[in-house]
Amino acid sequence: MKIIRAKDYKDMSRKAANIISAQVIMKPNCVLGLATGGTPGGAYAQLVDWYNKGDLDFSEVTTVNLDEYRGLPKEHPESYWSFMHKNLFDKVNIRPEAIHLPDGTNPDAADACKKYNEIIHSVGGIDLQLLGLGPNGHIGFNEPGEAFELETHCVDLTPATIEANKRFFDGNEDLVPKQAYTMGIKTIMQARKVLVVANGLAKAKAVKAVVSGPVTPECPGSILQMHPDCILVADEEALSLL
């Protein structure tokens, strides 16, 4: 795993965006695996800025997202579909038909997961997968204890994840979806390149476990030590325990 040090969140975001933009420039018809949440947002803002300056072209890019809440309509302001459109897709020239997320509105979990796996395979797999990192080392919604050999699957959100996400639902955890569809560890590990972003002291223990701890399902991100082309971009606080 290659580690790139950043001074702060802004620097981390720029360095991560540099890696993503290099992938798009090198292979204009690449497949990007994308993530949601607070950590990748700055990188998306930087990509939009470069697009507006004429430095990036997304017209041939295909995207597949890591995860989506189960049971939320696409148009719900807290769906990951909405997050991605608000932060990236509506601001660049990506083709609508080239945007893929798990279908959170499909009540048949097995069917939703099967169809998403088929989409990922049909586009030729993922060239670059962007990941955030949970404080407990989770990637996507793959929580501690998840089997490494899973592809897209339906998960029950842990109480800690529901608690962490209630801030997006007016502080009311009753409004937070209790399940989600997520790419599995197997799918993530099949990406040709993986880019992990982490910032802040709250992520320091997870970063240490992911980089130098034992490879174990109890820290899902630790499997990335086995990936042949994984880059971690993190700020000084997130790297403070290394």
Predicted region positions:
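A glycine- and small-aliphatic-rich helix-loop capping segment at beta-alpha/alpha-beta transitions
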Residues: Q46-D57, Y80-S82, P144-H153, V215
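Ligand-binding beta-strand-loop-alpha-helix segment within the catalytic cores
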Residues: L56-Q129
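Class I SAM-dependent methyltransferase SAM-binding "motif I" and its flanking Rossmann-like core
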Residues: G140-I185
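ATP/nucleoside-binding phosphotransfer catalytic cores, i.e., glycine-rich phosphate-binding loops
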Residues: M183-K186, Q190-L242
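Glycine-rich phosphate-binding loop
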Residues: G124-F148
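Short beta-strand segments
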Residues: G33-G37, N65, P102-D103, L130-L133, ...
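N-terminal glycine-/serine-/threonine-rich phosphate-binding loop
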Residues: M1-L32
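Glycine-rich N-terminal segment of FAD-binding domains in flavoprotein oxidoreductases
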Residues: M26-N52
